[in-house]
Amino acid sequence: MEIAYCPDYRSYKKIIPTLRKYSEDVIITIDDDVLYGHETLEYLINAYLQEPEYIWFMSGSKMAFDKNGNIKPYVTWYDEHLTALECNIKNFPTGIGGILYPPHSLAEEVTDETLFMKLAPTADDIWLKAMSLKQGTNCRQIKLNKPVMRFHTGIKEVQTSALCKDNIEKNLNDKAVHAVFDYFDLWKLFN
């Protein structure tokens, strides 16, 4: 195990320094305010070994659009049905269950701290999804025979101050989606 110090990239600390140092390696991220079951890494690695062209995730949602093609608020994305076997451009990985990133699955701008801190300073999941879209890498949820929540448990003492609360309650995720997707002109991919 290696402990490395880095600038305060907020939620990006778990991936940006690692992407810079180990760009040719598989990288798995997990949230630090969750306790994970022993099988979490096994599921992610086995999925990657079978189909290495995807970003694999345990928990997520599907980006939702209205009938006019406009993105719906982030809080409604969990209302959309996400089929684990379905590979869809709208699949949106969230870090709570763990995410496996194959080498070169994210666009080269992924480590541009000036850009991600300007466009999505608190929304690493949104930035990383945009970088996968820009790179042309699809995201797939792992098919499980039991609910994902059986594999990890939140730590209540830190959940009350979790970044996701601010991102949702203050609509920071919605602002980040628009900022990042507008900047990279990613909306055209959904038409």
Question: Where do the protein language model's features map onto the residues?
Answer:
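Active-site nucleotide-sugar/metal-binding loop of Leloir-type enzymes
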Residues: 15-26
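Short, high-confidence coil segments that cap the C-terminus of an alpha-helix
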Residues: 24, 51-54, 137
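A short, glycine-/small-residue-rich helix N-cap motif at loop->alpha-helix starts
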Residues: 6-14
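Conserved catalytic core of nucleotide-sugar-dependent glycosyltransferases
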Residues: 18, 35-114
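Short beta-strand-to-loop acidic/aromatic patch adjacent to the donor-nucleotide binding site
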Residues: 24-35
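Acidic donor-binding segment of Leloir-type glycosyltransferases
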Residues: 1-4
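C-terminal catalytic/acceptor-binding lobe
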Residues: 114-191
